Amino acid sequence: MNPTNPTPGITDLTNSCTDAFAYSTNVFLRDTGMRDPRRITTIHDIVVPEVGASYQNTAPDMAPFVVMQDDKVKVTAILVPHGPVFPAFAYRFDTAYGSVTFSGDTAYSTAVPRLAANTDILVHEAESFEGYQGPPALADHLRKSHTEVQRVGEIAHAANAGQLVLTHIADLTHNPIPVPQWWRWARQGYGRRVTVGGDLQRITV
């Protein structure tokens, strides 16, 4: 699709969404005096450091790098493997109150514990193939793109994370897996607090 720009970044995505909703936005601009969204947003595509990364080498060995910093927060990132997707990032937020690291969508990777070293909270995606009956091609894609829950605990342990929170939980079975089972799987190799995340949940640093 869109052969002239098949791999749009955040700037292109945002501009295309703005164009797609132009009619509605124009109505509200003229009829209600709302602010022009283009004047209240600043979009930045993340520039990947020169580490040999490409669509053929999506997550090479690298150090975390700063993507944003002000007097309240420092945000660092690292490339992670997410199947054919490039770039895919994990992010870490450091503040005076503590640190939180988000794995983002990622297959099992040593990049996450490198970024998340000694973080207060590691928020990590998780999937389970227990009882999976779908197409083999989809299973292959998912295994290359996501992390099985049974390995998330060892990632948290390697990072020395203070707490592990499961998110983006992919239950690939026909019969839903109970929350306690996700918790038990995630605790394998990790002896600290584990939380199975849910909608609208709040976790204090």
Protein language model features and the residues they cover:
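Binuclear metal-dependent hydrolase catalytic cores
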Residues: 1-98, 178, 183-204
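Short beta->alpha connector loops
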Residues: 81-84, 105-109
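Cap/insert and terminal regions of metallo-dependent hydrolase folds
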Residues: 89-90, 96-101, 107-201
